[in-house]
């Protein structure tokens, strides 16, 4: 997983509340067994509309999504996070996230930054005035900067640490590789073992 410290990118305003995982990526797109290639399913129902925000020229390369409250509700679907990331998003800003979505995001490398709704609405207003404007998200300082405006955001310390270190679940496990090998070397030979990668 790539380390996350600071990200600057075009921000897309998604002025909708209660965006659930089925709207983020419909179930019909969940049939593949890999973790990549889901970008075509992202907001598939809405992207058919030429007026949808991600179909507008200033936002086609957006990497920061500024969403309404209750983003990522619905079924537990890692594919929702993967679709956002495959499309190019590194950050989602919202005033409220579904807990499972927020957890899946941090584990996959997507920053789900929780902000005050009044700040989200001001960012929407600023983006309406400057379509295609870039936002800088600083995870170390927990700030979002758009032009002369700086806002704070919340993310729990553990998720922040994982993102800044670039640690997914496998990366976390590999930090203990020596201890795992030491344990395996002392384990009785008749018990199951992990086989070293060749």
Curated annotation (Swiss-Prot):
GO terms for cellular component: 3-isopropylmalate dehydratase complex. One of its GO terms (biological process) is L-leucine biosynthetic process. The keyword Amino-acid biosynthesis applies. It catalyses: (2R,3S)-3-isopropylmalate = (2S)-2-isopropylmalate. GO terms for molecular function: 3-isopropylmalate dehydratase activity. Keywords: Amino-acid biosynthesis, Branched-chain amino acid biosynthesis, Leucine biosynthesis, Lyase. Pfam families: Aconitase_C. It is an enzyme of class 4 (lyase). Its EC number is 4.2.1.33. CDD domains: IPMI_Swivel. The keyword Kinase does not apply. Heterodimer of LeuC and LeuD. This is 3-isopropylmalate dehydratase small subunit. It comes from Corynebacterium jeikeium (strain K411). The lineage of its organism: Bacteria, Bacillati, Actinomycetota, Actinomycetes, Mycobacteriales.
